[in-house]
Amino acid sequence: MTQLYGGIEAGGTKFVCAVGTGPDDLRAEVRFPTTTPQETIRRALEFFRDQQDRLGGGIRAIGIASFGPVDPNPASPTFGHITSTPKPGWQNVDLAGEIRRGLNLPVGFDTDVNGAALAEGLWGAARGLDTFIYLTVGTGIGGGGMVGGRRLHGLLHPEMGHIRIPHDRQADPFAGICPYHGDCLEGLASGPAIAARWGAPPEDLPPDHPAWALEAHYLALALANFICTLSPQRIILGGGVMRQSHLFPRIRAEVPRLLNGYIQARPILDEEEMQAYIVPPVLGARAGVLGAIALARHAANAPDSPIL
């Protein structure tokens, strides 16, 4: 019998649940809105129980790639909990524990962005690399990745969307929308920040709108910081805002300008190599749930070892 794995991409607006082994083998998939914890978790459990019945019990483990903040430390008493999220009703929910107890299966758990990064490392834009980052720019801004073949963990998990970047209030008097920090990266450059600043959602703004030069500048400032601190071999930019493909050439031009020759690496210095350095995700919208399946594979097979 083929060993199968369950994945849950737990998003703030929707859950995606799937069963399979990887991008070329997804046996079943379902999507439903994220409502209350009780209803949402119940629907996830029903999906996997139904698949277990159909497959004769072939699911070995479940992986969860969740919105956050979360506690991803297996040694912590609150491992698998969603912690200080602003989403009403979801604070301190033991998501991993509810799934583990409901299905009696091992559970792997991490942030949604670390999950997407993991999937891109195994099957997508960062395949073959051991140090890279994945930044998603959409309703919020979040980041994850791998350093030396290990997911970025430590005190908690990366909160790349909440770094502080230079904000010239004369050029951009917008105060920012982050309820915690105001004008952090997410407060200035997320999709809702663009809409609040310009009075229209990003998808309604034409490519020549001044919003995009400012957006590229803010994202390039963040990437310059990440390049200097993490030295990634590749940077993957996903999320709804990055569907504006004209942002990529703007960002690729702005990052070397900001670094000003200090980082002597060909992907930074060579315009052609830069095209392969700052890239969109290969797996697209499937990266999150595929990352969850990868977390499940790891939980079932080698929970105490590096994941790549």
What are these regions (language model features)?
Residues 107-111, 115:
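General beta-strand structural signal in soluble alpha/beta enzymes
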Residues 9, 63-67, 134-140, 144:
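Short beta-strand segments
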Residues 116-122, 143-145, 164:
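Adenylate-forming
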Residues 157-171:
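A short, polar/charged loop-to-alpha-helix boundary motif
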Residues 76-92:
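A charged helix-plus-loop insertion that forms the helical arch/lid used to bind
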Residues 1-61, 70-78, 97-107, 119-131, ...:
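ATP-binding/phosphotransfer module of carbohydrate and carboxylate kinases, centering on a glycine-rich
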